[in-house]
């Protein structure tokens, strides 16, 4: 019989995001992706809060998930101002981006991809 197992096939990686750095819109391989917010300085949330009523401003320090398959017009998005301790798990093919911030701080995150694999098993229940 075949069993499904979830595994982290690639090594997790640590991101050190500094002032003015960003991750462009992208997707990952695998079935699920995850990001753990290890250290998100409060300055990033304060910076994001100062522009929330200005619709023509970017989203400093925010993580955005963009719905819709790659190559098509997207149907919507979800933006979040992450904080230390947040964990996000999402479909690996979900487009997402991380916006830059201008505060002189470093945000530390850990990311990894999860693969759903099938394995043969001789065990019987």
What is the role of each PLM region?
Residues 3-8:
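Short, small-residue-biased leader/transition segments that mark boundaries at the very start
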Residues 1-2, 111-113:
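Short secondary-structure boundary segments
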Residues 10-89, 97-99, 105-109, 116, ...:
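Catalytic core of non-heme Fe(II) oxygenases with the double-stranded beta-helix
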């Amino acid at each position: 019989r075949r069993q499904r197992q979830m595994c982290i096939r690639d090594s997790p990686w640590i991101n050190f995001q500094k002032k003015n750095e960003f991750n462009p819109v992208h997707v990952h391989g695998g079935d699920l992706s995850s990001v753990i917010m290890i250290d998100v300085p409060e300055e990033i949330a304060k910076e994001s809060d100062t522009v929330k009523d200005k619709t023509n401003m970017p989203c400093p320090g925010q993580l955005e998930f963009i719905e819709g398959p790659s190559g098509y017009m997207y149907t919507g998005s979800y933006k979040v101002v992450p904080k230390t301790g947040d964990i996000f798990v999402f479909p690996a093919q979900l487009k997402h981006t991380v916006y830059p911030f201008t505060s002189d701080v470093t945000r530390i995150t850990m990311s990894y991809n999860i693969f759903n694999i099938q394995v043969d098993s001789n065990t019987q229940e």
